Amino acid sequence: MKSVAELLKLKAKHNQQVHTIAPHQMVLEALMVMAEKNVGALPVLENGVVVGVISERDYARKLVLHGRSSVGTPVSAIMSSPVITVDSHQSVDTCMNIMTDSHLRHLPVVENGQLLGLLSIGDRS
């Protein structure tokens, strides 16, 4: 059974970095980072602490469907919070079960309060 730590090492070998955003930044900025980095979600950090996750799904469901603008809306208004996190010692299978049971597609990995990485439901393999 592969651990989260092993998966994060593998992702690092393939230069898969974790990109983040702050809660006060505008949704448009988050969308630009996601598009530029070709990722579907960003952990939201405030003073180095994960306070949420913003995803393309959050954008579609909480902004577009309500006719709101990404220019004037802060990330904090649509991010998923409170956030469920896991640590690097957990198995990937356990984390996939957490995502499935919680209807999540992304799961931040936190160790001693520090963000180590972001798991995706696509990491299942």
What are these regions (language model features)?
Residues M1-S125:
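Tandem CBS (Cystathionine beta-synthase) repeat/Bateman regulatory domains
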